[in-house]
Amino acid sequence: MLGKRTEILLISALMCGIIGYAGLGLAIAGTRIAAAEGTVNTVVSHQNTLNATFRSINIQLTALGTRSSFDAPQAIALVETSVANAELASRTVSHDDVSLRNADRGLHEHPWLTVVSNAAVDRATNRIRHARQALAIARSLAADQVQEGRFWQALYSGLGDLGELNRQKEAGNLPGARQALTRMGRDVEQAAALAGSTGLPAELAALTTDLHKLAADYTRQLDAEAAEHYDAAAAISVDVSADMSRIAGFDVDGIGSKVDAFFRPRIDRYNQEIEAATA
């Protein structure tokens, strides 16, 4: 009888242990899954802000849409805002990715404790995987947008210098014109160095080449005028006018379409991964 009672006590203790283990496992898994789900939801909540940032990639082009009323300071301010937003997006993505990595690590600590909730843990893991894939895409988009923005900053600065050059020359202020020309050369050089940035069409490199030629021809014209070689200056002005016409033929809409065609698939993939993370 004593042996039988001992067996019953041992079985009862074992059952209590199993029930306790299962209960503890469920509690631990529930806490970890809730933390992971909360982290994923935070990442998903940033989707609209990041999409707005990515949509501003082509906004940087709008300042050239009406070249007759081109406002260099306004255009540069627009680009600076876009770059600042992209840099903020990059920081947000990095912070979110660290949070997701920590949440994923937490889900899989001491896996023997969460065996009873493996299916739920796997679902949370899958959500984290999709969210991190979305962030990897977002990180590359933000980095590309920063580089592209720096190109537009340099280009718009160069175009602003060109406007100032024309104003100074028309006012007969040759020293002022030369100063503007020097700034233009520096800014165009910087734009040319960035023209190969990811997502920028080849036409933009050609545009910086045209601006280089314009700066060189303008320098020749100013030199001729300073030396009072007015016939030579008049002949060179024909080249300057041709340069201006070529630059004025810059196809803003066509460039915008190419930029959009390059970035749109990546933006779509980002949104698809976010949608998968919410499933």
Residue positions per predicted region:
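Leu/Val/Ala/Ile-rich N-terminal alpha-helices, chiefly Sec-type signal peptides and the beginnings
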Residues: 2-141, 258-279
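C-terminal amphipathic alpha-helix
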Residues: 44-66, 116-279
